[in-house]
Amino acid sequence: MTPLVLIPGMMCDWRLFAPQLEALGRRPVLLAAPTKHDTMEGLAAAILAFAPPRFALAGLSMGGIVAMEMLHQAPERIERLALLDTNPRAEAPEVQARRIPQIEKAMSGRLRAVLRDEMKPNYLANGPDRQRILDLCMEMAIVLGPEVFARQSRALAGRHDRQAALAAYRGPALVLMGVEDRLCPRDRHELMHSLMPQSRFVVVEDAGHLPTLEQPDAVTRELLAWLEQPAT
């Protein structure tokens, strides 16, 4: 059974995938922590260093960006690829510019304010679990702390466009997004699907940027189906 490497998004940990982990049964799963480097290249290389020789790879948001960098660095090791609520392009200059004051604010002891006012409110669709998920996101972020926030922010700001890596990939692929994702909108996912025409493109209703938590059953079904596809 092919091992699965899961990469969470910015300022998230294994709990981002907690509902899916329960459904994966006896499949070997490695939960990556992209927290120790401030470049996308460094984050990807660190995960590749401990990953199995060949594996299935899934990442959400920043985790998807790290996954695409891993695909660029070691395409022969990735048996199948799932990209959730993410973006293959380099960071836009206007977003880069916003990161500097966010880092300064977080490092001055105001990480909670950065997350509350500038980031997390845009993550989720409206729904009965919205506040519970927001609280979980805040808890994960506070545990990781401002230094991780700064490193991840710098890695995102300096990342490269990885469309060419996707276009060259031929393995089973899943592109999935929440219909109300405002951070990584639909056109980014349609682009990834067009670059990997063999991929399945799924839009999850009643979900925003974190469908693994907002609509866990729907996401779990799609991930299990992706894992069961024949390898090429």
Q: Residue ranges of each PLM-predicted region?
A:
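Conserved HGGG/HGGXW glycine-rich cap/lid loop of the alpha/beta-hydrolase fold
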Residues: 1-46, 60
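Short alpha-helix in the alpha/beta-hydrolase fold that links the catalytic acid
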Residues: 171, 185-194
